[in-house]
Amino acid sequence: MRAWTWDLFCRVIDNWGDVGVCWRLARDLAARGARVRLWIDDASALAWMAPGGSEGVEVGAFDAALEPGDVVVEAFACDPPPAFVERMAARTPAPVWINLEYLSAEPWVERVHGLRSPQRSGLDKWFFHPGFSAATGGLLREPGLLAAHAAFDRDAWLAASGLARRDG
């Protein structure tokens, strides 16, 4: 079975939080065997955030996106370039188009996660809302995180840091 190609579109809006979320998603997908292309309008944050890059993640300029892959993710409603959307509509089968929204614990998120949004192009866009309940998209979690958390020795870390534990 061939690996799916994922195109992630990201516009840096404020303090690089957007690219941080997209970078984590790109790394996670690549670690699962997907081919990932991150199309970003300001890659300067990656110079300090991920100076070595990540195996399986290709980074390109936002407006330089080529032929659409199998899945297109627009982070935080950033809309892929119009010419790219035209190529999406011409592709058979059409790619799955996902609008990745911000993390929220608000109750309304459960009602809109997974909703279809028909587009002028004839394509459907699907809302993906990360969240904290089974009715949302959940959270990204690095492999081994729970085991590392369980093995963490707070007292030893504090002692090694020259800090004393305080109750409260």
PLM regions with names:
Residues 7-122:
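Active-site and donor-binding regions of nucleotide-sugar-utilizing enzymes
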Residues 5-7, 167-168:
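Residues that mark the start of a beta-strand
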Residues 1-6, 130:
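Positively charged, low-complexity intrinsically disordered leader regions
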Residues 102-168:
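A nucleotide-sugar donor-handling region in carbohydrate enzymes
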